[in-house]
Amino acid sequence: MAVNYSHSDFKRYGPDRAQQNADTIALVVNPVKSDTFAAFQGKIIAQAALSSVDWNYAPNGEDLQVTINGKSGIDPSGTAADTDDIAVAVFDSVGETVYLVQDATDRNITNDAGDTLNIPALVFYIREVTPVV
């Protein structure tokens, strides 16, 4: 089942708030929006540092495409089965705020010696406003 959600601060203040505060990108197994931050942390299976230069903005027609760079060669700290929901998350480890969670391809992830994985980039769009109805 696809898991996609964002924090109310992200919705209210846009990607600038997350870009200024988020310091980590991670692969998470079976995330739930209502998870406490401690529960969320327990679901992280791989993570990497994130900085403001990892955020890219590009016009896309009337919309704005936002891409957050993925990370490669990450040593996993946990495992996932192909039946688990895997998602990419962007969060602030100091402020304990999960800004974005975006569904990723579910697959088996092992944590054997020498295993590495790639955390995919997140891509989303800020849409042009729509007419009043």
List where the protein language model places each region.
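Small cysteine-rich, disulfide-bonded extracellular modules of the LU/uPAR three-finger superfamily
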Residues: 1-86, 93-133
